Amino acid sequence: MVTLTLLEKIYGLEEDRSFRSLQKHLSSFSSGLEAKIKVLGKTEQNWIQVEVSGSDSVVATNYLNQKFGLAPSSLEELKVQSELQGKIVDSGKIGYGLYVDVGVSASKKRDVLVPLYVLRKQLFEDEKLSIRRIIEAFCLHDNFPLRIKMTRIAIDKSEMEAELSEAQLTAFKNWVSLGLDRVIVLGASPEQIEYAIKKSGSMRDIIRVDRLGFFECSLICKLGTEAPGIISRLGNLLEGVPLYAFSPKKIKSFLKKAS
């Protein structure tokens, strides 16, 4: 029997419903194994903890690592050049970058800083945009899942910096080049999303749902459909769930000015 911390956070107004959704998914996966995956609860930073038991526990653990990612057990696991999955925290509260919680277990909370100058260079060709403009453009709000690559770690681990990983950067570039609006949903289960899309009559206007995390997703709008219109339809059905509009046109206008 082992207790694991998944790189998934539980948050929002309907935590019980979210826990049930995740447990249903995990039980469905483990039904064909000699293993049981039980959702225990969450850590102080809202990371989900599960208990894995049974003779197939190694298989189940590997699945959890591939599907969700497992939080580092200590600061010593963090190395320069290593890639990590995390969630944005305290978005917009500082002007010099974004902090990412990577789930590391430590006596004192340690988040990784992606500096403003790095975000400008990677996302906007060094255009001198404020952190708030960058956050709004790419919907980089609290709990947005972000994959980063460590670039600097202080000897005492008190300060850590990173840049966007190549995979994360490629994903963002693809979002822009595709040219389609997206609705970024932060804090809703797959069942909630499916219900809201059907109930609002938005099935024809949303061509695909891309999972960013178990409780986060990107709704890709069809050509000619704008994200704010979809948000107005979904808002009442996803009460309390943050919804953000991603507009490639807006980002391209920033890049055009930069050139």
Give residue ranges: language-model regions:
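OB-fold/S1-family RNA-binding modules
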Residues: 1-68, 131-259
